[in-house]
A protein has these predicted regions:
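Catalytic cores of nucleic-acid endonucleases
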Residues: 144-180
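Active-site ExK catalytic segment of metal-dependent nucleases
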Residues: 133-148
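Accessory nucleic acid-recognition modules appended to NTPase machines
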Residues: 1-137
């Protein structure tokens, strides 16, 4: 139906960003509950997946919003009718983030690795694209297509001693998805 197409397109335009069901409901013209139902259906059909915020109750960590990604970035690109090469795109960072996280999920699943997956962000807009918790081990990853460095959020490292933050870029991604 038209509502589902509108919702999918809205989600496709928001990959890598926090998503509000209330905002989506307003964009699509349906209730928040209808948006939630469609999102659950799309998840069960393995079209999209959600990442919730990682928080251990620090006052300045986001706790309510979520990010939604597509398992297949080709479907995402078809929804927004953008098949341009990376050099001609304005959404490279978000597309790279989506691709890396979806490939990491496949990597973990194919090896039977159980991981809790999140993103992390503070009210001061410090963020980490992907946080993975396996057992008691906390690993954080920042995805950058072109950059070779980034500023690690000290507040995260201080709040979660023993955790590590790694950069995943086009030169290092193979290790992250297990193909090196």
């Amino acid at each position: 139906p038209e509502v589902l197409e509108k919702l999918l397109k809205a989600l496709a335009l928001q990959i890598g960003c926090e998503v509000s069901y209330n905002e989506l409901a307003g964009l699509v013209g349906v209730s928040k509950q209808t948006v939630e139902n469609y999102v659950q259906l799309l998840e069960k059909a393995f079209i999209i997946f959600r990442l919730g915020p990682f928080s251990r109750n620090l006052r300045n960590e986001l706790k309510k919003l979520r990010k939604i990604y597509f398992y297949d970035t080709g479907i995402r690109n078809a929804l927004i009718n953008n098949f341009n090469p990376f050099d001609l795109r304005t959404d490279v960072g978000n597309l790279w983030e989506n691709f890396m996280i979806s490939e990491r999920i496949k990597y973990n699943n194919s090896r039977g690795l159980d991981a809790n997956m999140y993103f992390w962000r503070t009210t001061q807009k410090q963020e980490i694209d992907y946080v993975e918790e396996k057992g008691n081990v906390l690993s954080a990853f920042e995805f950058k297509w072109k950059k070779d460095s980034f500023k690690k959020p000290k507040i995260f490292l201080d709040a979660y001693p023993g955790s590590a933050i790694e950069l995943v870029n086009k030169g290092s991604y193979k290790k992250f998805i297990g193909i090196d």
